[in-house]
Design a protein with these regions (language model features):
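Glycine-rich phosphate/diphosphate-binding loops that line cofactor/substrate pockets in enzymes
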Residues: 39-53
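Active-site pocket-lining segments that scaffold enzyme catalytic pockets across diverse folds
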Residues: 52-55, 82
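Glycine-rich loop at the start of a catalytic domain that most often binds anionic cofactors/ligands
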Residues: 64-81
Length: 132
């Protein structure tokens, strides 16, 4: 199997890809929000296995679906509708991950400015990822 992640395997099956036409495997979805769901579920799968892990998250606004669905799944982890989605994508037996132990690493180049400034990397991470 090319993908070892249960989430990735589930999305591969859903995409109905019979064979890869490139050297690098890929996943197909039918919409941009579905990419957000897929990336949020894969992140939560990884975070559940690496609660003290190191992560680097983009500050790009195009990741709004990732942020939205990550918060949605975490906030509604025990609700029936969410449980059905988690089960569908291989996370039915995964306990809700605790993200408080994750460490952020800056991946983009930012001009050094005070963390208290509204457009600082620190502020962007807090507003977009931590506070949601």
């Amino acid at each position: 199997m090319i993908f070892t992640s249960k989430v990735e395997q589930s999305f591969l099956k859903e995409s109905k890809i019979k064979e890869f036409t490139t050297n690098i495997p890929y996943l197909l979805t039918d919409s941009v929000p579905k990419v957000g769901i897929m990336s949020a579920l894969r992140f939560l799968e990884w975070a559940s296995e690496n609660e003290e892990g190191i992560i680097s998250l983009s500050s790009d606004s195009s990741l709004k679906n990732f942020i939205h669905y990550t918060h949605h799944f975490l906030d509604n982890w025990e609700k029936k509708e969410t449980r059905l989605i988690l089960e569908k994508y291989g996370l039915g037996d995964v306990k809700k991950p605790n993200l408080s132990g994750l460490q952020f690493v800056q991946m983009a180049e930012f001009y050094p400015i005070s963390p208290s400034q509204h457009n600082s990397f620190y502020n962007q991470v807090n507003e977009k990822y931590i506070k949601g």
